[in-house]
Amino acid sequence: MIFQRTVQKMVKATGVGLHSGNKVTLSIMPAPVNTGIVLVRTDLSPAVAIPAKAEQVRETTMCTALVNDEGIRISTIEHLFAALAGLGIDNAVIEVDAPEIPIMDGSASPFVFLLQSAGIKEQAAPKKYLKIKRPVRVEDGDKWAELKPFKGFRVNFKIDFAHPEIARSQQHVVMDFSTSAFVKEISRARTFGFMRDIEYLRANNLALGGSMENAVVLDEYRVLNPDGLRYEDEFVKHKILDAFGDLYVAGHAILGEFTAYKTGHALNNQLVRALLAQQDAWELVSFEKEADVPVSFSVPSGAVFA
């Protein structure tokens, strides 16, 4: 039996909000089986809980944001959710004392470290996977994203930027997911942005917390960060990281192949919504025997922490 997972103990971290520039404290706590991921705004009185579900994603401009019916939001969830997905955390309560998750270093790596520090605990209930039964596709102009059947979880992602530095890098990655591959090859990829856009955003009181400490910054020709890139193909890998986080609002790890061209938060969420709306396109499955589990999910998360 493959079991659901939560964290063993509460852990906290403090960072800055990407858009506000203000200090943000984040706490991750264990949760009972079948809870899913629930985010809680503790800066409000009373505190407001928002379950992480696809229909709660109501803002996808520059980030993924959960918004409840009263308009209360928690923004920039995607890097944290990529870490939760990558380490196979099914259940957790996440408290934050601000309208956004701290940006940390612009990747999922600090959240991976935080979850590893908390420890991962198996729970007395079967883990459920969302198995793709037939292709589901969404399009927006020349951009598109698709989920189709596959035994495991494979990502086939291509970006297309005319910027000379990005054009020189590899812009197409195909990888079979595993916790180890996520931690080593994807989790450290940082968000990236262009100086021309940053100047405009700050003039409009956005990206006030953005800096070279938490993003790859480019001018018209090159990367401006003194230490350069973490991966030769960091740009496309960060887009994969974002997609991991965006897809996890489906509520379960996906068994299927995710293929995408030039997608972002909006199209990723549209794909999840389209999938869940077509109930003949998926089913929830569990695995009684570990031998039956696809290789992508067969190694417990803790195995890569030793």
Swiss-Prot record:
Pathway: Glycolipid biosynthesis; lipid IV(A) biosynthesis; lipid IV(A) from (3R)-3-hydroxytetradecanoyl-[acyl-carrier-protein] and UDP-N-acetyl-alpha-D-glucosamine: step 2/6. It catalyses: a UDP-3-O-[(3R)-3-hydroxyacyl]-N-acetyl-alpha-D-glucosamine + H2O = a UDP-3-O-[(3R)-3-hydroxyacyl]-alpha-D-glucosamine + acetate. GO terms for cellular component: membrane. It is an enzyme of class 3 (hydrolase). Keywords: Hydrolase, Lipid A biosynthesis, Lipid biosynthesis, Lipid metabolism, Metal-binding, Zinc. Its cofactor is Zn(2+). Zn(2+) binds at residues 79, 238, 242. Its EC number is 3.5.1.108. One of its GO terms (molecular function) is UDP-3-O-acyl-N-acetylglucosamine deacetylase activity. One of its GO terms (biological process) is lipid A biosynthetic process. The active site is at 265 (proton donor). HAMAP family: LpxC. Belongs to the LpxC family. Catalyzes the hydrolysis of UDP-3-O-myristoyl-N-acetylglucosamine to form UDP-3-O-myristoylglucosamine and acetate, the committed step in lipid A biosynthesis. This is UDP-3-O-acyl-N-acetylglucosamine deacetylase. The gene is lpxC.
